[in-house]
Amino acid sequence: MLTLKIFVYTVVTFFVSLFIFGFLSNDPGRNPNQR
């Protein structure tokens, strides 16, 4: 049970980090002329 909970938390954290990283990477990617 504890292992399953740790696995779930790891997957959730991984997806959240991926979403945040992708959002931050795409933000300046849409405006390459600003910088």
Swiss-Prot record:
Transmembrane segments: 4-24
UniProt record, GO biological process: photosynthesis
Entry annotated with the keyword Iron: no
Signal sequence coordinates: none
UniProt entry keywords in alphabetical sequence: Chloroplast, Membrane, Photosynthesis, Photosystem II, Plastid, Reaction center, Thylakoid, Transmembrane, Transmembrane helix
UniProt-annotated location(s): Plastid, Chloroplast thylakoid membrane
Membrane topology value: Single-pass membrane protein
Assigned protein family: Belongs to the PsbI family.
Recorded superkingdom: Eukaryota
InterPro entries, sorted: PSII_PsbI, PSII_PsbI_sf
Protein name per UniProt: Photosystem II reaction center protein I
Oligomeric and partner information: PSII is composed of 1 copy each of membrane proteins PsbA, PsbB, PsbC, PsbD, PsbE, PsbF, PsbH, PsbI, PsbJ, PsbK, PsbL, PsbM, PsbT, PsbX, PsbY, PsbZ, Psb30/Ycf12, at least 3 peripheral proteins of the oxygen-evolving complex and a large number of cofactors. It forms dimeric complexes.
Function noted in UniProt: One of the components of the core complex of photosystem II (PSII), required for its stability and/or assembly. PSII is a light-driven water:plastoquinone oxidoreductase that uses light energy to abstract electrons from H(2)O, generating O(2) and a proton gradient subsequently used for ATP formation. It consists of a core antenna complex that captures photons, and an electron transfer chain that converts photonic excitation into a charge separation.
CC annotations in GO: chloroplast thylakoid membrane; photosystem II reaction center
Taxonomic source organism: Tupiella akineta (Green alga)
NCBIfam families: PRK02655.1 (NF002735)
